[in-house]
């Protein structure tokens, strides 16, 4: 058996198209243009790539895109002052501060300063608490993308046994809450869990978000299970060439056991920016008291 490939390129393109349609409708019916502000501190090359991608896709969806670039040695007070300005700006419905921040800046204080209504990264404690309480919340983008991808295979996740490997605030913890909201039965595990392979073999859904290259082996997977691989790890090429990207799952082993699996690259990573656009449209609708959009 060879697993079905859950293609992030196709799914994210469809989602971006649906977002663009919602933006067009909101503009036509209400005269509102959803706006996303991205704050980049310093000049980290990887962050530069992400910011350019976000800017491009935001504009392609018909939304307003605002970029704010600050030097790596910016004072914490100046960064917080900018966030305060964006919180008060009616043209801005979503605020994203590109992480990680340079040394010397307090990421938690920055996240706390973002208006929860504009927190499109879903990291503000207010949104985390609302999600845990089963209330409407802006949800971290990667877990949201994971759920959308799982639902490409299963119309309903209700009653399914799911394991989430990883307990980060960015992925693992919010993903558990989203799965509980879907009425799945959830086990949360991590690199120090006892007999992790046995836990995985019980799962209909495996979400790997532990940040260790190819840690999850093919014989950990229950035959026919759906595997969502969140990991993005650079490993040296065996022939000494360019480094290659691999996930947290040993793809070439797992694809012969799983029923469906996301590749790396070409999987969950492509969903993250698409879900950022979803959150921006949802935030704009909530801020203006509009019905929840159809994305």
UniProtKB/Swiss-Prot annotation:
PROSITE patterns hit by this protein: THF_DHG_CYH_1
A family per Pfam: THF_DHG_CYH_C
InterPro entries: Aminoacid_DH-like_N_sf (IPR046346), NAD(P)-bd_dom_sf (IPR036291), THF_DH/CycHdrlase (IPR000672), THF_DH/CycHdrlase_cat_dom (IPR020630), THF_DH/CycHdrlase_CS (IPR020867), THF_DH/CycHdrlase_NAD-bd_dom (IPR020631)
SUPFAM superfamilies the record matches: Aminoacid dehydrogenase-like, N-terminal domain (SSF53223), NAD(P)-binding Rossmann-fold domains (SSF51735)
Catalytic activity: (6R)-5,10-methylene-5,6,7,8-tetrahydrofolate + NADP(+) = (6R)-5,10-methenyltetrahydrofolate + NADPH; (6R)-5,10-methenyltetrahydrofolate + H2O = (6R)-10-formyltetrahydrofolate + H(+)
Record-level Gene Ontology MF annotations: methenyltetrahydrofolate cyclohydrolase activity; methylenetetrahydrofolate dehydrogenase (NADP+) activity
CDD domains, per database record: NAD_bind_m-THF_DH_Cyclohyd (cd01080)
E.C. number(s) listed in UniProt: 1.5.1.5, 3.5.4.9
Record-listed NADP(+) binding positions: 166-168, 191, 232
UniProt keyword terms in alphabetical order: Amino-acid biosynthesis, Histidine biosynthesis, Hydrolase, Methionine biosynthesis, Multifunctional enzyme, NADP, One-carbon metabolism, Oxidoreductase, Purine biosynthesis
Pathway in which this enzyme or protein is active: One-carbon metabolism; tetrahydrofolate interconversion
Single GO cellular component term: cytosol
HAMAP family documented for this protein: THF_DHG_CYH
Main function: Catalyzes the oxidation of 5,10-methylenetetrahydrofolate to 5,10-methenyltetrahydrofolate and then the hydrolysis of 5,10-methenyltetrahydrofolate to 10-formyltetrahydrofolate.
Protein name, as recorded: Bifunctional protein FolD
Gene for this chain: folD
